[in-house]
């Protein structure tokens, strides 16, 4: 027989600029995705007024010329004029706001800088933004104190807007990072969504029951959820804090050494006769795939009732992870049909109705 399903919602994308420059959106339409949520992990295309090259990890969205939207209303107008083949809903990135008002991203913001960020955030919410995202694990936001985010989150309350976060750590201190996210949600009385929940790093494998127990505990008194992608590898910029010989790391791009794209960091270091860390420093700025998760943890998180499906695909990456094109078919074909992790209707719910409800998307996710 045949199955009728709503268009899928990709809740975790970095399609901010590609929906304008490549509105056909073939990587998403080919999977059945009809709505994308952009602005995740603290990085968004707007509101941004760059004074130079985009800081890491905003460079995942494109080069300086891609950031042409000083106000969210400018970005919204550009998306509408591009007529992308998918619906677009947008978060405002904390790191994007910081880049507009701070001369040094490796510190916490001053009271005046926070006030300026709040004005921009409110203006964006007035223009239709869904909420605020943070990427506190990245160097460009890691030194932001919790109070900085608490103050920004207060702007979300009146709108019932959502707070999503790439946690301050997905490694050993992940539970403390989750507690920080829940604190922010309680403070502003807003829903919290933890981005790509995972147990990162070999020393962290097997801890998914602890993470999910913390999520369930928080959900008893507050609206919280998470998204995840159906793969045991992550992809982002090359982060020196994640350089290790405990698992494989593949370089996807490098500005000073473009020919190294597609090669393993271990091989590059061996060819150069240097340590992994020295090789990583030479390659930066660069992108990488980290094979740093355990399949059992991925399955456990994916199957949990509070988890949604998000691809976290990187359309600007010259060697993108398969999740850009294949996340949703992998959930349906591999995890639901072949593995039997959950029935088809549960798989569909995780990429439609649940997603629409958590992000407050009306007239989406249901038939």
Residue ranges of model-derived segments:
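Active-site mouth loops of central-metabolism enzymes
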Residues: 10-19, 101-115, 138-144
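C-terminal helical cap
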Residues: 264-299, 329-367
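Structured alpha-helical segments in the cores of large, soluble enzyme domains
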Residues: 116-129, 145-158, 174-187
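Divalent metal-coordination and catalytic microenvironments
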Residues: 1, 12, 32, 88, ...
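Acidic-and-aromatic substrate-binding clefts and catalytic sites of carbohydrate-active enzymes
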Residues: 18-20, 141-144, 169-175, 201-206
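Polyanionic/metal-chelating signatures
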Residues: 47-68, 73-76, 95-112, 185-192, ...
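Divalent metal-dependent hydrolysis catalytic cores, especially in the metallo-beta-lactamase
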Residues: 27-65, 85-100, 125-140, 157-169, ...
